[in-house]
Structures are given as C-alpha cells and as structure tokens.
C-alpha cells in the first residue's frame, strides 16, 4: 500500500488535506476493467470507468473505477442541488440558486483537497461527470436567452 500508514497519518495530522489518496497495485489477470464495471453497476446506480492512455499507446496506464459517490452535484437553470451521503449512509440535500455555479464548485473542491504524491497519476479522485453545452450561459449572458432542446442538466457531477 502506498503511502504507508505512517505517511498517511503524518499527512492527515498536517490539517492541509480533506482526502489522502491511497494506491494498491492489482494484477488484472482475472477481471478486466469492464467486468469490474459490470459488478460495480450492480452495486450502485452511480459508477464510472475512466481509462488513461497516451496518444501513441493502445493500452491504458491506469483504470479509474468509482461508485457510490459521497456527493452529487447538479445544476439546471441556476438551481444547484447538492446531495451528501455520509459514511453511515445518512443523506442530506441542499438547494440554492446561483448565477455562477463555478464559484460553488470551487468552494466544494477546496474541502476535498489532496496531496500530490510521487508515483501517483495526475487524477487521484474528485468530481466526475459533465458540463453540458448549456453551461456556457453562466459565462456568456447572451446565451441565457437560448433554451437547449435536449434535457441535459447544465452540470451533473
């Protein structure tokens, strides 16, 4: 396991980080990432698989799998909804109207800051989802008058 337990304890005691990434290498000779994704899909309606690869490589260097998020964030027409799921499965939800969802997203991300550690990929966790085309209306007011025909949320993370 990387980092060691003592290193994790030291990072946690520094008070600088809301999360500390932990890595364990697993040989993928029994299940492919797609097979693991199918298993996770049965356990949670929210799951994802991200594969990394350099442009000249066929195979990915890392497979990122995630499920059962502790936070869900959506925004439609300025109405931002944040759903928290704690470790004891207690759920809370808050709603607010905003003209600038980016501010709220940055505020949330500060709480989950993690250290950059040697030997780890650039992405060690965080928000996963999408910003739709309609999200541009928050940066460009003239686009607010146009209503998209699709039923996508402006943000779904």
Residue ranges and their predicted role:
Residues 1-157:
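Signature of the chorismate-utilizing enzyme
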């Amino acid at each position: 396991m990387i980092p060691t337990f003592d290193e994790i304890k030291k990072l946690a005691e520094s008070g600088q980080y809301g999360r500390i990434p932990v890595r364990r290498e697993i040989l993928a000779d029994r299940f492919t990432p797609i097979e693991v994704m199918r298993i996770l899909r049965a356990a949670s309606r929210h799951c994802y698989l991200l594969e990394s690869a350099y442009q000249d490589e066929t195979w990915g260097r890392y497979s990122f799998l995630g499920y059962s998020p502790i936070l869900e964030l959506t925004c439609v027409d300025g109405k931002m909804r944040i759903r928290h799921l704690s470790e004891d499965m207690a759920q809370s939800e808050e709603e607010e109207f905003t003209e600038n969802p980016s501010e709220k997203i940055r505020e949330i991300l500060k709480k989950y800051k993690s250290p950059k550690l040697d030997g780890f990929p650039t992405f060690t966790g965080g928000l996963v989802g999408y910003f739709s085309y309609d999200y541009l209306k928050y940066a460009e007011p003239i686009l607010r008058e146009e209503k998209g025909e699709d039923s996508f949320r402006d943000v779904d993370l």
